[in-house]
Amino acid sequence: MARAGQAVDPSPLGQPLEFHFARRSAPNRFLKAGMSERMCSWTEENPSARGIPSRELIETYRTWGRGNIGAIVTGNVMIDPNHIEAEGNPTIPPNALFSGERFDQFANLAAAARANGSLILAQISHPGRQTPSHRQPEPISASDVPLDTENMGNTFAVPRAATENEIKNIITGFAHAAEFLDRAGYDGVELHAAHGYLLNQFLSRATNLRTDKYGGTLTNRMRLILEIRAAITEKVRPGFIVGIKINSVEFQPNGIVPDEACELCCALEEHRFDFVELSGGKYKNLEEDDNAKHIISKRHEAFFLDVAQKVVSSLTKMKSYLTGGFRSTAGMVDGLQTVDGIGLARPFCQEPYLCHDILRGKIPGAIIPVMDQLNYQLTVAAACIQMRQIGNKVQPVDLSSQDAVDAITAAAEGWLKRKAIDRSEEAFKPPLLSGDAAPLSVEA
């Protein structure tokens, strides 16, 4: 198998990172970025029973916790079971109790992930217009701007603008989720304000056409996020970490541009966000977007590093992570000249102990997949399949092998067809590929 990079000194990546406002430290500069795992409970009939972490999901995070990742971010925790990104999302409903099966399973996940010293953070989110139309025919958003695309077999209904009362409920939902997670033993949360989800829909001029106090100027468009931050402060202990994920650039007219991202980051620092994770893009196949292809072809890794340099240049207290395209240790070390930490997502699905092996100088970087990395839906499906393999203690399928990629492609196509007609929990979970796969080591 081919790997990215050449041997370099990885020690800068092993340095602790202190979060100024929470007065907490991550043991190193790696961040496992949030992904949609789709391994929680699902039921058609009873929304209140949706989104309870499964044994498989807990085992996945136990494995990542063994890998010496500095900060581990769970994927896309929904705050409303009727507004979800995908079936199988972890969910904290607004009436969730601080006891019972849901609370216990979230607590078990946190304990498993942090058992070896990693920080565990939950990414909390509302999909807004990016909820499947067969799940929510009347989604809410900043405005009634439709999402004209298809993602993982899903289409999306035309949203309506959220009322001020609904906005208040959203703020309460985020704050309740943070309190729930704090009590369950999490070190912090990350607000998901990137990739086209609801908070991003309020930030972006492309989707926010409001004329009230939540629309127009950037000050108004970021108001919802800052009100959520204030509400969380009232519900959690002082040392609870609060971060946020934003797009540093968007591939659409009137989307977030670097100047706005820079202004936004200054406001986030002023309102005591501990870190910002910079990413880019929305629900759209990257192979269809010329601007995205240009950025990715220009930089073979660290796709948004040039933009990040401008965005974070004025920050003094809020820490910054950059996620998107890092594969070589050399590229990661170089990235630390611009940002404070390095976010990785899909590489940890292929190699859950990647961080451990890099920090010990055992490898020069991540395995290079032969799969087309611009094929958004296929790469997402592959990551979901690998995460479920990890949750079942099976070595993830090797995407540097064309035979394995062919198998993943066939499995992904079958998955999309199956979940279109079968509404059971098992049908919505990623396919479980085992075959001749070796058991996953319990030690990094």
Swiss-Prot record:
Give the induction annotation: Expression is regulated by the aflatoxin cluster-specific transcription factor aflR.
Q: Where is this region: Disordered?
A: 127-149
Q: What is its main location?
A: cytoplasm
GO molecular function terms attached to this record: flavin reductase (NADH) activity; FMN binding
Q: What EC number is given for this enzyme?
A: 1.-.-.-
Q: Does the keyword NAD apply?
A: yes
Residues binding FMN, per UniProt: 37-40, 123, 345-346
What's a GO cellular component annotated to this UniProt protein?
cytosol
| Record localization | Cytoplasm, Cytosol
Keyword Magnesium recorded = no
**Function comment:** NADH-dependent flavin oxidoreductase; part of the gene cluster that mediates the biosynthesis of aflatoxins, a group of polyketide-derived furanocoumarins, and part of the most toxic and carcinogenic compounds among the known mycotoxins. The four major aflatoxins produced by A.parasiticus are aflatoxin B1 (AFB1), aflatoxin B2 (AFB2), aflatoxin G1 (AFG1) and aflatoxin G2 (AFG2). Within the aflatoxin pathway, the NADH-dependent flavin oxidoreductase nadA is specifically required for the last steps in which OMST is converted specifically to aflatoxin G1.
- PANTHER family assigned to the protein according to its UniProt record, in alphabetical order: BINDING OXIDOREDUCTASE, PUTATIVE (AFU_ORTHOLOGUE AFUA_2G08260)-RELATED (PTHR43656), NADH:FLAVIN OXIDOREDUCTASE_NADH OXIDASE N-TERMINAL DOMAIN-CONTAINING PROTEIN (PTHR43656:SF5)
Protein's name in the database: NADH-dependent flavin oxidoreductase nadA
Source organism: Aspergillus parasiticus (strain ATCC 56775 / NRRL 5862 / SRRC 143 / SU-1)
Q: Which gene encodes it?
A: nadA
